[in-house]
């Protein structure tokens, strides 16, 4: 997503929009990343152990394997993440779950042209089944 379209001095939340179907399984760990230009200070990557049913209501995270990198151009939230909340299912059957937030100070997030968000599971070679991802939604949120 091009960061030029983001409002300055605004906090945003990223949501994954998805559906699950019969026999949904195989999603034990995911990584969530906000990636900027090539140096470690220009990116933030969090690793979350979400259990096999990570899209279920109120699942606890284990933060022991978390890695964070910060940029001086953007401020990322550092509050402890205690649970993932599944939002209400929309009229169209799609659900949305928040998986991260960031603050765009201005002049483009992280001094780059794009923001990249990923949901990945590469550590476990188990078959994945039953998850349909519509996309990632970026929404402005109220300041804490």
Swiss-Prot record:
Protein's name in the database = Putative protein PHLOEM PROTEIN 2-LIKE B4
Q: Which GO terms describe its molecular function?
A: carbohydrate binding
| Organismal lineage | Eukaryota, Viridiplantae, Streptophyta, Embryophyta, Tracheophyta
Native organism is Arabidopsis thaliana (Mouse-ear cress)
Which InterPro entries does the record associate with it? PP2-like
């Amino acid at each position: 997503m091009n960061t030029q379209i983001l409002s300055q001095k605004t906090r945003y939340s990223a949501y994954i929009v998805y559906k699950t179907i019969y026999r949904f399984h195989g999603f034990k760990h995911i990584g969530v990343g906000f990636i900027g230009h090539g140096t470690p200070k220009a990116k933030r990557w969090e690793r979350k152990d979400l259990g096999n049913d990570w899209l279920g209501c109120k699942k606890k995270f284990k933060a022991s394997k978390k890695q964070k990198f910060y940029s001086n151009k953007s401020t990322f939230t550092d509050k402890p993440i205690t649970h993932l909340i599944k939002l209400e299912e929309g009229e169209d059957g799609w659900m949305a779950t928040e998986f991260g937030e960031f603050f765009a100070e201005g002049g483009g997030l992280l001094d780059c042209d794009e923001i990249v968000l990923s949901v990945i599971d590469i550590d476990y070679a188990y078959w994945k089944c039953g998850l349909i991802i519509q996309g990632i939604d970026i929404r402005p949120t109220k300041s804490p």
